[in-house]
């Protein structure tokens, strides 16, 4: 009887359940979207119970639709949208407020106040993160400050906090396991990534009671078992947890120091495994925990690009220049170059290494001869220039020259982007056969804990190359194009709305 690992990929807009066999191949997928709530401008929230219901639905569907029995599931791995914050009643199990999503800016004033009080460097040194509404800590404080009776209840031990992984493990285990893993804990602004413990000073600054925090565990370990009534009467080990970008790093088998993966999703996320060293960034990168496994922790440098694949959606939905995302490739390849046109897609500001939240999108170099093809090509090229910006920052901070770039996410299907990426970073780009690397990473972590896979070497053998893109552009051309991009970014930052 064939066994499988069930991976739950709980994302920002949908929940997915994916079955993987021992070769790391997909044996079934189910997906369900859920509602986004926008109570005020810049606020983004989810209903944690809707997320839980969607997860139950996809787990049931993937098993039923693929003629798999529950006793064929060897273990469950969970990967999640990071930073999204849930606070719930320990006794009733009900969330006391909507889940505050990673994108939400409703805690900006808390961050500003802590910065004014001079604590930015304290947070940076201990957590590797920026003092920004993006991360979970200020979201917990906001809920405790704004929900009536919440703070008193928390101080009396009546509330629990968790990122989405914690919430799902708690629900699946029938309230038995209140845990998170190192990768998710490292995104909270409350966890000291050097001591590997919740930090009392940071908790005091955020006024968050320690008793509501989950226990922090390795990313690969049996945390508990499914309560029988949630899983067809079976008690299945819940055995792997990692935040989505760290899970993708693991799913890409980036196990060695200097290994890098880049995800081209709505935004772009590049992570470099820095081994057992937490590298302090001087270039606007985040220092974070990649995963904890085999009794030790691996660290990573992370760069964030705010607009990546969503630039292609903008061409389709906003400008109506294309009817479908794949069409962008055929338009881009009809011309040999952009004829000097640059698109800087700073629609919501610029991420790593600029961190300029006030910059807005801009286009440079238009002439009467500029056609739709040039414009589309320039938009696609912008994804690659931004990736080089991040990669250069990583090499500078780590002292490691990137030898190859493993890629995943929706935009990697576009061969033009992949080739231009290789050309502009002067590094080979490797596209894997299985591009569901986030879910695969969670499956691998769970599978290692239950003996489904023996070792990381076992997993590395599963990684198969679909296509490799080697750089073909000459050095002079590459540097001339990149100088133009840097000039365009500089001009974008000069031109800001009043």
UniProtKB/Swiss-Prot annotation:
Belongs to the FGGY kinase family. Activated by phosphorylation and inhibited by fructose 1,6-bisphosphate (FBP). It comes from Staphylococcus aureus (strain bovine RF122 / ET3-1). Keywords: ATP-binding, Glycerol metabolism, Kinase, Nucleotide-binding, Phosphoprotein, Transferase. GO terms for cellular component: cytosol. Transmembrane segments: none annotated. Sn-glycerol 3-phosphate binds at residues 12, 82-83, 134, 244. Gene3D superfamilies: 3.30.420.40. The keyword Phosphoprotein applies. It holds the Pfam family FGGY_C. Disulfide bonds: none annotated. PROSITE patterns: FGGY_KINASES_2. This is Glycerol kinase. Key enzyme in the regulation of glycerol uptake and metabolism. Catalyzes the phosphorylation of glycerol to yield sn-glycerol 3-phosphate. The lineage of its organism: Bacteria, Bacillati, Bacillota, Bacilli, Bacillales. ADP binds at residues 12, 16, 266, 309, 410, 414. Pathway: Polyol metabolism; glycerol degradation via glycerol kinase pathway; sn-glycerol 3-phosphate from glycerol: step 1/1. The modification Phosphohistidine is found at residue 230. Homotetramer and homodimer (in equilibrium). SUPFAM superfamilies: Actin-like ATPase domain. One of its GO terms (molecular function) is ATP binding. The phosphoenolpyruvate-dependent sugar phosphotransferase system (PTS), including enzyme I, and histidine-containing protein (HPr) are required for the phosphorylation, which leads to the activation of the enzyme. It catalyses: glycerol + ATP = sn-glycerol 3-phosphate + ADP + H(+). Glycerol binds at residues 82-83, 134, 244-245. Its EC number is 2.7.1.30. GO terms for biological process: glycerol catabolic process; glycerol metabolic process; glycerol-3-phosphate metabolic process. ATP binds at residues 12-14, 266, 309, 313, 410.
